[in-house]
Design a protein with these regions (language model features):
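Eukaryotic scaffold repeat domains enriched in small/polar residues
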Residues: 1-315
Length: 315
């Protein structure tokens, strides 16, 4: 009998072996994942094939992005027009691609970070999103800043907000960003265990607390899907701290959560969720930085599972 995870309208089964690769190609690990309007799945990796493309069933279609990125690719977002935004905190850029692999734009001075905590773009940016109503680009910046930056769709700088701290409108680590159809901007503030909501100018609206190290986030229909990272140093192996998926309505009410208390590579288990996507059927794809969190510390180091699919089950 198949095992089903979740509750009510949000019930899922693990898809064994989704995303098998051709001989000689490996993920290493997957910091991001996104799905286009045709249910093609784009997986961001830290291997030699930075952006891999699969069909919905998990058949490998090819890759692109070689020579464009460092080994610290970080966030992947797909916009309403199917363009892809890729954050690379190793070279301090946000790059925009078409789904055929053509680079369309690059924001940031490659390999020239701004002053750490200085507030100027960019110092290790984490993610970017596009506002559908006007095409503006919102960037979470990230590891060396506690800041949100806004650009026009043509790449002209507009304004920024945020500073280090725990008050409303401040961030410890803005790790992911999304924009809904009402122009509300959602920012994952990972180390504060919360998601903050803003208007397009950066005015604070509200915050949702008690979300364990939210790392990944995607809007789909009238819900937000969140991947939660494991515990921090000293409690990083504690059961029940993160390594799970949570689903919220747009008022911040949790409607579903799944993920075993113990981390792992089995069905229903996660190690380090870092990217999340949902296709037109409601199936969930979870990308993980399992090598960074666990695999590189093993003796000898080894690659761990870093992409998985959960198929939505009809009630």
């Amino acid at each position: 009998m198949r095992e089903v995870y979740g509750v009510g309208d949000f019930r899922y089964e693990y898809v064994e072996g989704w995303g098998k690769l051709p001989e000689g190609i490996r993920y290493l690990e997957c910091p991001g994942v996104a799905v286009d309007g045709q249910d093609n799945v784009y997986v961001l990796t830290r291997g030699d094939h930075p952006i891999m493309v699969f069909d919905r069933e998990g058949s490998y279609q090819g890759s692109f992005g070689q020579t464009y990125f460092s080994d610290r690719t970080h966030g992947l977002y797909i916009a309403h027009d199917n363009s892809l935004l890729v954050a690379d905190d190793g070279i301090h850029t946000i790059q925009k691609f078409s789904t055929d692999g053509t680079q369309m734009m690059e924001l940031g001075a490659r390999n020239q970070p701004s002053e750490r905590w200085g507030g100027e773009p960019f110092n290790r940016p984490t993610s970017a999103a596009i506002m559908p109503s006007n095409g503006d680009i919102y960037v979470s910046d990230g590891y060396g800043n506690s800041r949100i930056h806004v650009y026009t769709g043509t790449g002209e700088y507009k304004h920024s907000w945020g500073s280090p701290g725990i008050d409303a409108g401040q961030f410890i680590r803005p790790h992911n960003i999304a924009v809904d159809d009402n122009d509300t901007v959602y920012v994952v503030d990972r180390e504060c265990h919360r998601i903050q909501l803003f208007d397009p100018q950066g005015n604070f609206i509200t915050m949702w607390n008690n979300i364990h190290r939210p790392d990944a986030m995607v809007l789909w229909q009238d819900h937000i899907y969140v991947g939660e990272l494991n515990g921090m140093g000293g409690v990083d192996d504690a059961p029940g701290l993160g390594h799970r998926v949570s689903i919220y309505d747009l008022k911040g009410n949790m409607v579903c959560r799944f993920g075993a208390a113990e981390e792992g590579e089995g069905p229903g288990q996660f190690i380090a969720p870092h990217g999340i996507a949902v296709d037109s059927h409601g199936d969930i794809y979870v990308a993980e930085v399992s090598y960074t969190i666990r695999g590189r510390h093993m003796d000898p180091p080894r690659e761990l599972r870093s992409i998985s699919k959960y198929r939505r089950v009809s009630s």
